[in-house]
Swiss-Prot record:
This is Cysteine--tRNA ligase. GO terms for biological process: cysteinyl-tRNA aminoacylation. It is an enzyme of class 6 (ligase). A motif ('KMSKS' region) lies at residues 271-275. Belongs to the class-I aminoacyl-tRNA synthetase family.
Amino acid sequence: MIKIYNTMSRTKETFKPLVDHKVSMYVCGPTVYNYIHIGNARSIIAFDTIRRYFEYRGFEVKFVSNFTDVDDKMINSAREQGITVPELADRYIGAFKEDVQAVNVEPATLNPRATENIDDIIAFIADLMDKGFAYAVDGDVYYRARKFSKYGALSHQNIDELEQGASQHVDDEETARKEDPIDFALWKAAKGDEIAWKAPWGTGRPGWHIECSVMSTKYLGDTFDIHGGGEDLQFPHHENEIAQSEAKTGKQFARYWMHNGFVTVGDDNEKMSKSLGNFVTVHDLVQKINPQVLRFLMSTTQYRRPIQYTQASLQDAKNNLEKLQNAFINLNYRLQGAQGAADATVAEQAAQLETDFITAMDDDFNAQNGITVVYEFARLINVYSEKTAVNAEQINQLLTSYAKMAAVFGIELKQIENDDAEIDELVKQRDQARADRDFETSDRLRNQLKEMGVILEDTPQGTRWRKKDE
C-alpha cells in the first residue's frame, strides 16, 4: 500500500485514488524565459520518478504539467532579446523538451500553455468576482484572501502573520489599491505595449497563480489526486491555488500535496536559483557529462530531501551507474551457451528483492532505500553470472526484473553493442597470446586497447570488453 507524505496534513497518508488504478497528477512546470537549471530539473525528475513508480505498480497515470508562457520575467526577457513573448516561449519550450528528453523524463500526458487558456482564465476570474471572492481596481483584479476561511492551511501559517508579512513586502502604491495587504493579483492591467488580452474589467494578462488553478482543473477536474512542486511553491503559489480553486468549485482541490527538496550548492548549502546566480543549466551540463549521471543523482535521493550538487556527488553517481550497467552487461553476456538448470535459490532471492523494492518505494517513494535494493539485485546477478552453468530463461527473467526496477529511476539498462571489428580482432589476438603464455604481447595489446578507450574484463567464460564511459 503506497503511503504519501501530504504537506497539508504533515503526515504520511495511505494513497487512495479517486478512481481505482488511476492517478491524476498536476506538477507546476517552468516559466519558459530561459534554460532550466539543475534545481528546476530536481522537481521534474522527482515527479517523473514518482510517476514511473505508480506505473510500475500498475496504475494508469494522467500527468499534467504546465508552461508559464506569460509573466513579468517573460516580458522582460523578450524585451531584452528584441523578440516577442510568444517567440521567446517557443524557443525555450523547445529547449525544455530537449533537456528533459536528455535526462529520460517521460513526456507529460499534457503540457498546457497559459496563453492557450486565456478564455478559461477570464471565465474563472469572472466566476470568482460573481461569488464575491475577487474585485477589480482600475483594470487589475485581486482575490480577497481573508474571505477564504482556510487560507494559510497548506503552509500552516496564521492569516494575521501573513498580513504582517504582506505589508512589509508590497509597495505602497499596490497596497493602496488593495482592500487588504494579503490580497493577491488574478489579473494585471496592461502597461504600455506589453502582451495583453481583452477582459470585461480591462485589457491585461493573468497572474501566475490563476493560471495553474485553471489548467489543473480544466484537464484533471475540480478535484484530482496529487499536486506537486518544489517546496518553495507551498506559499504563496500553492496556497493561492487552493484559495482560488476551492472558492470557485466549493470542492476539495488536490487530495495530496507533495513538495520536493532543493538542490544546494557551496559550503553553506545555498539553494540553487537563477536569482542568486549560482546555477548550472541542464543544457550546458548534459553536453559535458552522460545525462544518465545527472538523472541518477536526482532520482535516487528521497524526493523531500535536499541534494547537494558537487563534482564529488556527480562522480559518485557516475560510479554507481556504471556498476549497475556492468552487472546487466555481465549477465547478458552469459546468454551465449546458457544451457544449465535454473537455480531455485537465486529465483527465491530475486523474488524477495522485488518485494523489498516495493516495500521501500511504497513508503513515500523512498528512492534511497529503493536504489539500495537495486544494488543488492546487481550483486545477486553478478554472483549468478560467475556460475559455471547458468539458465537462459532465468537470465532473461533476472534481467527483466532488474531493468524494470532501474527504470523506475529513469535508468536505462541495456546491452551495449560492441560491433567494432578491429577491437574484436585485437581482443582475440590478446586471448591467443595469453593462451600461448606470451605475456609481453598480451600486455602490449592490453595497453593498445586501453589507449583506444577499451576496458577489458577477463572471466572464466572469456574476455569481455566495453568502451570507456559507455
